[in-house]
Each structure stands twice: as C-alpha cells, then as structure tokens.
Amino acid sequence: MSSSEEVSWISWFCGLRGNEFFCEVDEDYIQDKFNLTGLNEQVPHYRQALDMILDLEPDEELEDNPNQSDLIEQAAEMLYGLIHARYILTNRGIAQMLEKYQQGDFGYCPRVYCENQPMLPIGLSDIPGEAMVKLYCPKCMDVYTPKSSRHHHTDGAYFGTGFPHMLFMVHPEYRPKRPANQFVPRLYGFKIHPMAYQLQLQAASSFKSPVKAIR
C-alpha cells in the first residue's frame, strides 16, 4: 500500500480478499485508550501495531528492517481483529454490521426450511487461535462453516461468541421467527418413528458375531 493511494490502513485491510466480514472500526474508537484495555498484553509489538492501524509514521528502524515490518503487520491484523470484536458490540458497530447483514454480505443459511435466511459471523471462542469464524443463523439458531474457503482462515475471536445475540437484543425487530417447517424422514411415504434409529442401534450393539472355533 503506497502513501500516494491515500487509503487508510483500516480501509485497505477491510478491502482485502477474505476480510469481507469485517466492518471499518471508527478511528476515534481506536484512539480511546479505554476501549483497548488489556490488549497490550495479548498482542506483540502492540505500540507499533497500533501506530500502523492509525496510519502514524513508522520508526526508521522498522522501515529498514523488512522482517520486523512483517511481524508488525501480523500484529496489526491481530490487534485490529480484537478491537473489531469489541467495536461490533457497540451501537455504532452494530449499526454497521446490521447493514451488512441486511445486504446478505455474510451469506445465507444452507438449511432448506430457513428459506435463505441471512446469517451473522460468530466465534466459537473468544481466545485468538482456537477456532475460525463460523456463521450463525438466527432462524434455526445453528452455526455453519462459511461457504467460501477464503473465509476459513479468519479467526472467530475477531467477532466473538456473543455478537449475534447482542445485535438481536439491541434490535429485536430484526430477529426472525423460528422455521415453520421441519424435515420429517419418510420411507415409502410413512414417517419414520423417532425411536426407530435408537432401537436399531440397540439391536446392533447387542448382536454378537459367532466366534470361530480354533483348530
């Protein structure tokens, strides 16, 4: 990214292929130290990473050391992700993500009876490195792996475990109704009793194969 492009680091990062789920965090939110409490203990090269996010001039030593620059870039991406997880729980962040949700930017539920219900990104852990981002369907209330492989390497901690639930607590009017229909397995037109599979498993577990005689 060259300085002549006049594109902020945040806009550049959110515009990268695979980062479509992110919204652009307001710089004034990032500049408020209260919002970043504790992150300096989680992110290496914290000060340099923060300067990079805010487009502040890097140290001369950093410019002369490309290996160090790569480490700072990685730290900046991690720091932005953790800031993003906090930001999308605020009113401003929710408003930005709600707009993306309404546009279907996060994809649609693959479940047939959810009828193309838009989904929201969610993390299965708030700790970085534990799980990649998943998609939550507010209709069937289940989670799915993103359809596109380019989203399979986005850390779920950058969205957090509570984001979709916070959004619908703030905006209950956007919470969809539960699905009216549910798939019913049938065989020759007849419904399969829910106990059928359980009885089949019990029968299989109690079945003992004959022991061959040793000659």
From Swiss-Prot:
The keyword Metal-binding applies. Pfam families: CK_II_beta. Residues 188-193 are annotated as: Interaction with alpha subunit. Belongs to the casein kinase 2 subunit beta family. GO terms for cellular component: cytoplasm; nucleus; protein kinase CK2 complex. Phosphorylated by alpha subunit. GO terms for biological process: erythrocyte differentiation; Wnt signaling pathway. Keywords: Metal-binding, Nucleus, Phosphoprotein, Wnt signaling pathway, Zinc. Casein kinase II/CK2 is a tetramer composed of two alpha subunits and two beta subunits. The beta subunit dimerization is mediated by zinc ions. Zn(2+) binds at C109, C114, C137, C140. The keyword tRNA-binding does not apply. GO terms for molecular function: metal ion binding; protein kinase regulator activity. It is found in: Nucleus. This is Casein kinase II subunit beta.
